[in-house]
Amino acid sequence: QSAQFRELEYALGIKDRIELDWFSGIEGERLTQRHASATLWDAFVGVMHRQGAPVPAHVLNRDVRETVIENAELQAVIIDRYSDEGFAGLCETLTDLDEGLQEWRYRHVMMVRRTIGTKMGTGGSDGAAYLATTLFRPAFPDLWAIRTAF
């Protein structure tokens, strides 16, 4: 996996620490900084809070170095606000982004399988086998979890 793709994942909220060891030099420094920074999801949650939504304190104060995980309390807040057209549109845009990332991953896995088969990947991973484990790892799990509420 490229450093640029890792930066994108870190910016969205998918933060696997083990991958920091795969990069050195300027790439490693940039990734370490991005890993320690707030995410797009954190910004989204912060906007909700500033607009008066009762976002749980532990969600607002989460360790930004950790991957965003599902939170039932936050899901209830999101569902409650979904009747607001602008808010719902923003949620749908984030879901579109997340879906696009997952679709890109699938296409990437298939390209890798076609190109190198089961050989080791260029980033030091197990190649296509590793990539396949990332296919259904959403950046915004709460936006997927609430789908059953509609």
State where each predicted segment sits:
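C-terminal accessory extensions/subdomains outside the catalytic/core fold
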Residues: S2-F150
